[in-house]
């Protein structure tokens, strides 16, 4: 789960990470009120969306007067901000963060990620923070400072000092940076984070170290014990189909292809997507109906897939163990009767009660394409998709 910048900063501040003063606003008038309460004469008005690269997309505006603050908020609120990380559809801006724009001398980068290959937390830092860090990481990986954390002991002070010195800081700045690095790690660890990015981490003229921006993501599987974080969820920033799927205990992730997938089991779902790609097609989604899928759940899965207007064909691939092929077949028939399926439907069933499932489909009178193997099913789905486009 992702959170907004201001929410990430509230969490970081609670762990002792220094952040600029700021306040969230949902209207231009609230933005002006926030600026007056914060004081000063220079503010940043930041669009709050679950994506980075806002600066290059015009999502961060610097203001020197209250009128400029009002105009900036009015320009951002209610719009869809398109950045390099949002895709062409963008993300809706329903709130802005008004922050004191303190002058600074240097921009650094600090990040924490779960390195799944190493099975460790990896701390990443760089002297070259700011908007171009992605390009720097891709073209000049040697510019990144990387430290792997041993989970039995956690991030150590000597590792934080090593990072701080490699960032080229003076003695006074090193002390502040070490505190920031250690406290940010505690926030990442204690909140079940999967990603924390502070970009930029700035150094001011008086040697303070501030988190000028922050992005945090959290492990969905741990939210049951992090209710304060779960309550930060903003459904407007996600795919509404994913939220609907979660309500029915379905795992759904929308993609940009044209072949909808309804599969049981995450591994089989990924294999199905791979086979579609291998056959020359593009999957429109990842959808795992899980074990023990009832006819109602399968019908819901169809409604989710068909809500994507890009879908030109649907591939149902079920290997029934805990599940039952006859239940899935009943769900397919139920969906066809309740939802207009106007795209080719390819079905491959195997496992428990497969003969009963095939019989239900055969007697349903549905216009569908059957397959006995995954390779055959993927090939037929791609052929049907291409035929539907012509």
Curated annotation (Swiss-Prot):
List residues binding Mg(2+): 199, 213
Residues where ATP binds: 46, 99, 102, 107
> Its annotated pathway?
One-carbon metabolism; formaldehyde assimilation via serine pathway
Q: Which UniProt keywords apply?
A: ATP-binding, Ligase, Magnesium, Metal-binding, Nucleotide-binding, Tricarboxylic acid cycle
Per its record, what are the GO molecular function terms?
Answer: ATP binding; magnesium ion binding; malate-CoA ligase activity; succinate-CoA ligase (ADP-forming) activity
Provide the protein name. Answer: Malate--CoA ligase subunit beta
Looking at the UniProt record for this protein, which Gene Ontology cellular component terms does it annotate, in alphabetical order?
cytosol; succinate-CoA ligase complex
Which parts of the sequence belong to the ATP-grasp domain? 9-244
This enzyme's EC code(s): 6.2.1.9
Give the record's GO biological process terms: succinyl-CoA metabolic process; tricarboxylic acid cycle
Catalysed reactions listed for this entry: (S)-malate + ATP + CoA = (S)-malyl-CoA + ADP + phosphate
Q: What does the record give as cofactor? A: Mg(2+)
| Cofactor comment | Binds 1 Mg(2+) ion per subunit.
Which SUPFAM superfamilies does the entry link to?
Glutathione synthetase ATP-binding domain-like, Succinyl-CoA synthetase domains
Metal-binding is among the record's keywords = yes
NCBIfam families, sorted: PRK00696.1, PRK14046.1, sucCoAbeta
Instruction: State the top-level EC class.
Output: ligase
Q: Per its UniProt record, what PANTHER family does this chain match? A: SUCCINATE--COA LIGASE [GDP-FORMING] SUBUNIT BETA, MITOCHONDRIAL (PTHR11815:SF10), SUCCINYL-COA SYNTHETASE BETA CHAIN (PTHR11815)
* Family from the record: Belongs to the succinate/malate CoA ligase beta subunit family.
Q: How does it assemble?
A: Heterotetramer of two alpha and two beta subunits.
Domain of life from the UniProt record: Bacteria
């Amino acid at each position: 789960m992702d959170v907004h910048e201001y929410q990430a900063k509230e969490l970081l501040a609670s762990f002792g990470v220094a952040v600029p003063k700021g306040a969230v606003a949902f209207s231009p008038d609230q933005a002006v009120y926030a600026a007056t309460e914060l004081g000063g004469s220079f503010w940043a008005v930041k669009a709050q969306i679950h994506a980075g690269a806002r600066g290059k997309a015009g999502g961060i505006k610097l203001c020197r007067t209250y009128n400029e603050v009002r105009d900036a908020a009015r320009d951002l609120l209610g719009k869809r901000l398109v950045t390099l990380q949002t895709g062409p559809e963008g993300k809706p801006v329903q709130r802005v963060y008004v922050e004191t724009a303190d002058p600074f001398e240097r921009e650094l980068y600090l990040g924490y990620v779960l390195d799944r290959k190493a099975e460790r937390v990896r701390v990443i830092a760089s002297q070259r923070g700011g908007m171009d860090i992605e390009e720097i990481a891709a073209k000049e990986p040697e510019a990144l400072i990387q430290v792997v954390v041993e989970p039995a002991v956690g991030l150590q002070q000597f590792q934080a000092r090593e990072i701080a010195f490699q960032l080229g800081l003076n003695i006074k700045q090193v002390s502040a940076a070490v505190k920031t690095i250690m406290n940010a790690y505690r926030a990442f660890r204690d909140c079940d984070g999967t990603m924390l990015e502070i970009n930029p981490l700035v150094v001011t003229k008086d040697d303070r170290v501030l988190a000028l921006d922050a992005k945090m993501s959290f492990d969905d599987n741990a939210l049951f014990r992090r209710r304060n974080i779960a309550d930060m969820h903003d459904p407007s920033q996600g795919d509404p189909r994913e939220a609907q799927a979660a309500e029915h205990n379905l795992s759904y992730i929308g993609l940009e292809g044209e072949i909808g997938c309804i599969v049981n089991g995450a591994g089989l779902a990924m294999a199905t997507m791979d086979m579609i790609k291998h056959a020359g097609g593009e999957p429109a989604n990842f959808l795992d109906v899980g074990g023990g899928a009832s006819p109602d759940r399968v019908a819901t899965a169809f409604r989710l897939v068909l809500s994507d207007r890009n879908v030109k064909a649907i591939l149902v691939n079920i290997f029934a163990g805990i599940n039952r092929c006859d239940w899935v077949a009943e769900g397919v028939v139920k969906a066809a009767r309740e939802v207009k399926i106007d795209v080719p439907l390819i079905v491959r069933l195997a496992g428990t009660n497969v003969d009963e499932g095939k019989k239900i489909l055969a007697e349903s009178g549905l216009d569908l394409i059957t397959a006995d193997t995954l390779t055959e099913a993927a090939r037929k789905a791609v052929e049907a998709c291409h035929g539907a486009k012509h």
